[in-house]
């Protein structure tokens, strides 16, 4: 069923079966369920108290808790623009993002808020109903993408149309709500189908959340799924897993299917409010395009998307970047390479942009990373690439040994999440090949 707002979802199911659980979480060591009727009432109550803040953007340091979900829904219902930030991000990143989104107030853990030393700004360019997500990069090149509750609800509808859940299902929400895949596929997908959403207890409970909540459906990034499979943590009630936000090895998908669990692989972007295509058959890499979307493949192989109900309003306060993201006739340029088979299913084959995407959902902006490494390796001709999911440093004509290189880049390594650290070093005999404009021909690395 298609909804236009978060309140629409709650009001509909509170009217159809008010006592059915909307959310289940741990509270004081006990499992607590909140019905659709109870959640709706709580949202209305909190929204009333937030209306005094009209015209200000509320930055929510999302921790995935019940209170966090309530705050998001209530702030939007009160007419406040909202920016969702990852509560576990480094303090410096959070300060930059608070400033970038023109936050007028902030919600989150009191100690964290005090530590950040937040200072409210008086003006915001965001509108009521706008929800800002920062693209999942770890550099200051990450942009704030302006979505809306309507575009997010439409995205949830698209997912439910291809992979429907029922009121008897429980969807496990273990991903950050500050990531659009986690928000749509870990929360809205379940609620828009009238299912119950189990709110995970954080990374330290990855090892026992599935056994504790007993979900029937799960959305996961490849890194999380790999951990769950490796440690035999998939619960017996689980019947469907949606995997997205990064490349997923075929062996991992096959390991899940071998347990009798249906697995679907999804493709989407923050700029399209998450999902664009989902695999429905035996081939996880042949993805059916979502009902509201159209795809085409450009001459250079780039995937382009027409998603009028789900596409972003733009990048916050960055009209030039917004204009550059679209063709003259309105197609979104994804920076991904792919093809469409005879059945119209999407196959993603690689990336065109100078960005690496990792299995934990984060991204690395290559020109900036390479500039940092060049400062540690002056005079070296170098580039980064990704092979088998690992970061590889390629040097052209270098006279340094691998040990000398490892020592030189050690300061850069220690500031990176493990997924982004250099895993291998390769050498070419001569200089790296480049285009006429001086860019490395990454496809030749």
Describe the residue ranges of each PLM region.
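Conserved pre-ATP/AMP-binding loop-to-beta segment of ANL
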Residues: 3-4, 18-21, 118-134, 140-141, ...
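Conserved AMP-binding A3 loop
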Residues: 33-37, 130-156
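Conserved AMP-binding/adenylate-forming
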Residues: 48-88, 174
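Gly/Ser/Thr-rich phosphate-binding loop
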Residues: 215-220, 228-283, 380
């Amino acid at each position: 069923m298609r909804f236009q707002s978060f309140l629409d979802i709650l009001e509909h199911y509170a009217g159809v079966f008010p006592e059915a659980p909307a959310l289940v979480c741990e509270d004081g060591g006990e499992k607590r369920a909140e019905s659709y009727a109870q959640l709706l009432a709580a949202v209305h109550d909190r929204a009333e108290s937030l209306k005094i803040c009209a015209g200000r953007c509320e930055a929510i340091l999302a921790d995935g808790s019940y209170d966090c979900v309530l705050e998001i829904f209530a702030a939007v219902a009160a007419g406040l623009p909202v920016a969702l930030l990852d509560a576990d991000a480094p303090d410096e990143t959070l300060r930059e993002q608070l400033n970038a989104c023109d936050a007028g107030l902030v919600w989150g853990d009191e100690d964290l808020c005090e530590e950040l030393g937040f200072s409210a700004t008086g003006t915001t360019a965001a509108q009521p109903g706008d929800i800002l997500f920062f693209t999942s990069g770890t550099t200051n090149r990450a942009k704030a993408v302006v979505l809306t509750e309507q575009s997010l609800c439409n995205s949830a509808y698209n997912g439910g149309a291809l992979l429907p859940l029922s009121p008897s299902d429980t969807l496990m929400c273990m991903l950050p709500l500050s990531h659009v895949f986690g928000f749509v596929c870990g929360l809205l997908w379940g609620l828009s189908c009238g299912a119950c959403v189990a709110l995970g207890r954080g990374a330290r409970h990855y090892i026992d959340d599935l056994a504790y909540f007993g979900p029937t459906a799960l959305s996961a990034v490849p890194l999380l799924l790999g951990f769950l499979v490796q440690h035999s943590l998939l619960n017996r009630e689980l019947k469907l897993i949606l995997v997205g936000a990064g490349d997923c090895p075929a062996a991992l998908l096959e390991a899940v299917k071998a347990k009798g669990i249906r697995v679907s692989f999804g493709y989407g972007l923050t700029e399209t409010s998450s999902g664009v295509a989902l695999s429905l058959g035996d081939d996880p890499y042949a993805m059916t395009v979502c009902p509201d979307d159209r795809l085409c493949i450009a001459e250079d192989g780039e995937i382009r998307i027409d998603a009028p109900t789900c596409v972003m309003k733009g990048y916050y306060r960055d009209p030039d970047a917004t204009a550059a993201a679209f063709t003259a006739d309105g197609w979104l340029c994804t920076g991904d390479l792919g093809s469409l088979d005879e059945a119209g299913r999407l196959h993603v084959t690689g990336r065109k942009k100078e960005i690496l995407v990792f299995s934990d959902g984060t991204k690395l902006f290559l020109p900036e990373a390479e500039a940092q490494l060049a400062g540690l390796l002056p005079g070296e001709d170098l580039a980064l690439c990704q092979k088998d999911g690992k970061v590889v440093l390629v040097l052209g004509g270098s006279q340094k040994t691998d040990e000398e290189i490892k020592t030189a880049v050690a300061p850069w390594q220690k500031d990176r999440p493990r997924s982004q650290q250099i895993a291998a070093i390769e050498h070419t005999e001569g200089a790296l090949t480049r285009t006429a404009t001086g860019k490395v021909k990454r496809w030749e690395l």
